[in-house]
């Protein structure tokens, strides 16, 4: 079973037909695994246009397409999607899609099992990505931007729980 990466994505594009096709793919999947990333970065001839673990990790940034779509909405030129991926965010697929389809995007992601949180944005020509560890000696609010923490409000409370557990374990060792 993979570690699940939570993702909150916003794509903006003048090509509303393309955005509608992405939303339609999410609706047609009807709870199954949509071919969302496959629309952004399609399989290629070298893998016979079929799923391949190494290819997906290299070209999508994750081994499977998105799943557990919790929210999807299209409003004019803006598509918003909240979903899950395996182990890591689909940054490579989003960048490929951005370069091929001319959209901009913002992606916030959090992977609790691997203890990281991040933000990626693409402006249509290039992208910027920043990732932070969530379990350090310092509270996440002291080094992670508010907009990133706002996307995943449980990160701060999880850190406080972890700090409390660490203190309890240390006390047990001292008492032994």
Can you say where each PLM-predicted feature lies in the sequence?
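Long, contiguous binding/interaction regions
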Residues: 1-176
């Amino acid at each position: 079973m993979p570690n699940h990466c939570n993702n909150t994505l916003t794509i903006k594009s003048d090509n509303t037909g393309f955005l509608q096709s992405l939303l339609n793919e999410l609706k047609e999947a009807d709870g199954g695994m949509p071919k969302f990333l496959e629309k952004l970065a399609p399989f290629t001839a070298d893998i016979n246009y079929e799923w391949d673990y190494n290819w997906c990790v290299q070209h999508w940034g994750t081994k499977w397409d998105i799943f557990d779509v919790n929210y999807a909405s299209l409003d004019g030129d803006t598509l918003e999607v909240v979903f899950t991926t395996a182990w890591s965010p689909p940054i490579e697929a989003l960048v490929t899609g951005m370069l091929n389809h001319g959209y901009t995007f913002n992606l916030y992601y959090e992977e609790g099992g691997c203890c990281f949180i991040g933000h990626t944005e693409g402006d249509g020509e290039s992208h910027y990505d920043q990732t932070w560890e969530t379990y350090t000696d310092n509270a996440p609010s002291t080094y992670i931007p508010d907009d990133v923490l706002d996307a995943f409000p449980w990160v701060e409370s999880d850190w406080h729980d972890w700090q409390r557990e660490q203190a309890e374990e240390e006390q047990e060792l001292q008492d032994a």
